[in-house]
Amino acid sequence: MGYGQVDHSDREMMALALGQARASLEAGGVPVGAVLAAGSASQGWQLIAAGHNERVQRGDPVAHGEISCLRNAGRRSSYARTTLYTTLSPCQMCSGAILLFQIPRVVVGEAQTFEGDLGFLADRGVQIVLLDDPGCKAVMREFQERYPQLWSEDIGGR
């Protein structure tokens, strides 16, 4: 599949994910938010779940934004018509979850702060849409300035 086009609902859904990222930042955590939606560009998207990184808040090293969102979605028989919106490019663990659940489309707010594994996902048939969203970049910059030690402990130290 590779890289795809932005549809009319992508920015609206990304705004919800960004709200999740801001909630994490205000709680002293890593500002990565995610939402899972079902539907299509022609029929519109319906929100299934939202979540944000809670690695710091819960002391849980695997509570990344995407994982928290998927956990909040609960059990589903299929992810075939879903899109995962994430404010930052997914790491290897989150990319693995995307592949495991066969989520066909991922919309990424920004990949400048952390490139993640977008090529890995695209090579395996996941449609990637990169929004290059200024709000997503800004929340990561604010986090890096406010919590430099936490940033270096997380993906900033790699």
Predicted features along the sequence, with ranges:
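Short beta-strand scaffold segments in enzyme catalytic cores
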Residues: 31-46
